[in-house]
Amino acid sequence: MLRVALAKGRLLKSFIEYLQQVNQIDIATVLLNRQRQLLLTVDNIEMILVKGSDVPTYVEQGIADVGIVGSDILNGQKYNINKLLDLPFGKCHFALAAKPETSRYKKVATSYVHTATQFFNKEGMDVEVIHLNGSVELSCVVDMVDAIVDIVQTGSTLTANGLVEKKHISEINAKLITNKESYFKQSSEIERLIKQLGVSINYA
């Protein structure tokens, strides 16, 4: 039995849509009908649903053999895992966003401090980065900050709050990661999963 850790939320929705596209209907159906279950089994695969930022930890600790997680999570911290595959879903990007008239950024809010700090340092910008856990758009709307750094998929949330994208920072996509020991001990099961997903190994 192969245990796979899946990130809940936006990425899980994108994963289910992708499973339907590649005709893995059984797995997609189980995930769609999960209700509040956090542990599901189908086709000799046990899936555990966890917070995105926890997926690498579950894999690193050997609780899960495989994980599917956003590349943004992996960029913020070092994990003792195999970053095996880029996956063709969960595509979005980090962006700097603000009100249309804003051109100077002294104070910026984000849930992704590492990415934001890295970006501003690279740009040579002296910016105070404020950490928020959610609804970062509001901080800009009420003028607590000049801008935000956030994940953008369609841009509809920015538009709904009167904000525009000022700078495209970096791309994000789903990654398949494995526990280092499981990669050898359960190589055939992992290869089978990769074939089911219709992707090939590129050692990303």
Swiss-Prot record:
Catalytic class of the enzyme: transferase
Gene3D superfamilies (UniProt xref): Periplasmic binding protein-like II
Pfam (any one): HisG
An annotated Gene Ontology molecular function: ATP phosphoribosyltransferase activity
UniProt keyword Kinase present: no
Catalytic activity: 1-(5-phospho-beta-D-ribosyl)-ATP + diphosphate = 5-phospho-alpha-D-ribose 1-diphosphate + ATP
GO cellular component: cytoplasm
Subcellular location as annotated: Cytoplasm
Major localization listed first in the record, in broad terms: cytoplasm
Family listed: Belongs to the ATP phosphoribosyltransferase family. Short subfamily.
Assembly and oligomerization: Heteromultimer composed of HisG and HisZ subunits.
Protein name: ATP phosphoribosyltransferase
Native organism: Staphylococcus epidermidis (strain ATCC 35984 / DSM 28319 / BCRC 17069 / CCUG 31568 / BM 3577 / RP62A)
